[in-house]
Swiss-Prot record:
InterPro entries: Ribosomal_uS2, Ribosomal_uS2_bac/mit/plastid, Ribosomal_uS2_CS, Ribosomal_uS2_flav_dom_sf. One of its GO terms (cellular component) is cytosolic small ribosomal subunit. Belongs to the universal ribosomal protein uS2 family. One of its GO terms (molecular function) is structural constituent of ribosome. One of its GO terms (biological process) is translation. SUPFAM superfamilies: Ribosomal protein S2. It comes from Baumannia cicadellinicola subsp. Homalodisca coagulata. Pfam families: Ribosomal_S2. It comes from the Bacteria. Keywords: Ribonucleoprotein, Ribosomal protein. This is Small ribosomal subunit protein uS2. Transmembrane segments: none annotated.
Length: 232
C-alpha cells in the first residue's frame, strides 16, 4: 500500500500555507506556526491524514468504486487529467458546471449529445454538412469535450470525489455533500474544512505539491484495482 513520507511532503512544499491575512480560523488545528507572514501547516498532522485518505481511496477502488478527480485551477488542470487517466478514473479539470452531480439527468443528456457528435465526426457525417454547419458542430463538440470529456464514461454518480483546492471547488463539494458522496480534499489555510470528509491539510498552489498528491492518489487507486483483480 502506497504511503507518503513527511520528508517528501516537506520537499514538495506541502507545509506552505497562504498569507496569514487570508486564513480561515477553522484551519487553526492544522497550523504549526507563522513564517514571513505565511502560515506553516503541521506536516505531523498532514502525513497521517493523507495516508489515511489514501487507504480509504484504495478500499473504494478495490470495490470497483468510481472516483472523480476535481481540479480546475491552471496549476492543477493538466495534472488532474493525467492522474485520473493513469488509474482509469474520471475528472473535471475545467469549469465545474453547476448541477454536474445534483442534476445528473440533464448532464447525462449533454454527454449523450457529446458522444453523438464524436460519432458523427469519426464516421464522416460532419463532412457532408455545409462549411458553416460543420464549424458550428465542431465548436460545440470542442466545448462539450472540454467540460464533459472527463466524465463521459462515468455512467452515473461517482462513489467519491478527490479535490485539489476545496475553496475553489466549493460548489462541487456542496453538491457531493447534498448527495452523501464522500469528499477527499486538499485543504489550504484559507479554506473552511467543513464538508470535507477526509481533510488533507496542505499547499494547494505549488505544482510540486499538487503532483505529489495526485501521484500518490493514482497509485493507491491502481493498487485497489489490482487487489480487486486478484480477488476475482
Amino acid at each position: 500500500m502506497v504511503t507518503v513520507l513527511m520528508h517528501d511532503m516537506f520537499h514538495a512544499g506541502v507545509h506552505f500555507g497562504h498569507q496569514t491575512r487570508y486564513w480561515n480560523p477553522r484551519m487553526k488545528p492544522f497550523i504549526f506556526g507563522v513564517r514571513n507572514k505565511i502560515h506553516i501547516i503541521n506536516l505531523e498532522q498532514t502525513a497521517p491524514m493523507f495516508n489515511n485518505a489514501l487507504f480509504e481511496l484504495n478500499k473504494i477502488a478495490s470495490r470497483k468504486g468510481k472516483i472523480l478527480f476535481v481540479g480546475t485551477k491552471r496549476a492543477a488542470s493538466e495534472a488532474i487529467k493525467e492522474a485520473a487517466r493513469s488509474c482509469d478514473q474520471f475528472f473535471v479539470n475545467h469549469r465545474w458546471l453547476g448541477g454536474m452531480l445534483t442534476n445528473w439527468k440533464t448532464v447525462r443528456q449533454s454527454i449523450k449529445h457529446l458522444k453523438e457528435l464524436e460519432t458523427q465526426s469519426q464516421d464522416g457525417t460532419l463532412d457532408k454538412l455545409t462549411k458553416k454547419e460543420a464549424i458550428i458542430c465542431n465548436r460545440k463538440l470542442e466545448k462539450l469535450e472540454k467540460s464533459l470529456g472527463g466524465i463521459k464514461d462515468l455512467g452515473g454518480l461517482p462513489d467519491a470525489l478527490f479535490v485539489i483546492d476545496a475553496e475553489r471547488e466549493k460548489i462541487a463539494v456542496k453538491e457531493a455533500n447534498n448527495l452523501g458522496i464522500p469528499v477527499f480534499a486538499v485543504v489550504d489555510t484559507n479554506t473552511d474544512p467543513n464538508g470535507i470528509d477526509f481533510i488533507i491539510p496542505g499547499n494547494d498552489d505549488a505544482i510540486r505539491a499538487i503532483n505529489l498528491y495526485l501521484t500518490a492518489v493514482a497509485h493507491a487507486i491502481s493498487e485497489g484495482h489490482q487487489k480487486n483483480a486478484l480477488e476475482i
